[in-house]
C-alpha cells in the first residue's frame, strides 16, 4: 500500500535503534523537519555508511525544527520486555520534543499510546523523511554510546558489533560474564550469568 502523508503541518517522525543488542539502552528519536530547510539524502540509517550518517546527523540536528531523544535502559527492558520498553522510549522521545507535533509517524507496525494522532508506517525509515531523520539521529546516538562503553570494557568489542549477538560477543560473554550494562532477560546473557 502506498504511503500518503497526513494533512498536518507539524509532523514528527519516530524510530528506534537497539532492539536486538544484548547490551545498552534502546534509543529512540523524534524529529520534526523544517520544510524551509530540506535535507538531501535522507534514507534508512542502516543503508548509509557511518560517515554519511554522521554528516546527516549534524545536518538534521542543525536544520530540523526540533528533535529529541527517548530511551529505555537495560533494567527497564528486563522489567517490561523489549517491545514495551521500546514503546516507552518512543513515548519519551515524543514527550521530550520542545514543539508538540500535530501528528506522529512511527516506523514499524505498532504505535505507542500518544496524546496526538499517530500512524505506524511499515518500512517507514525508507518512505518518510521524518522517520529517516529519526532513524539517523537514534543510530548515531546509540553507536556513540557503544563507543563510550567500549572504552570502559574494551575486551567485549562493543564499538565494532554495537552490542549485537555476534559470535565474538557471545564468546566474550561466556569467557568474561556480563557487564552491568547487559540485558539480563536476553537468553544469551541469561546463559552466560547462569540464570536459568
Swiss-Prot record:
Subcellular location: Cytoplasm
One matching Pfam family: RNase_HII
Keyword terms of this UniProt record: Cytoplasm, Endonuclease, Hydrolase, Manganese, Metal-binding, Nuclease
EC number, as in UniProt: 3.1.26.4
GO cellular component, one term: ribonuclease H2 complex
GO molecular function terms noted in the UniProt entry: manganese ion binding; RNA binding; RNA-DNA hybrid ribonuclease activity
Keyword Glycosyltransferase: no
Record-annotated RNase H type-2 domain positions: 9-196
Cited InterPro entries: RNase_HII (IPR022898), RNase_HII/HIII (IPR001352), RNase_HII/HIII_dom (IPR024567), RNaseH-like_sf (IPR012337), RNaseH_sf (IPR036397)
Residues engaged in binding a divalent metal cation: 15-16, 107
Biological process according to GO: DNA replication, removal of RNA primer; mismatch repair
Principal EC category: hydrolase
The protein's required cofactors: Mn(2+); Mg(2+)
NCBIfam families attached to this UniProt entry: PRK00015.1-1, PRK00015.1-3, PRK00015.1-4
Name of the protein described by the UniProt record: Ribonuclease HII
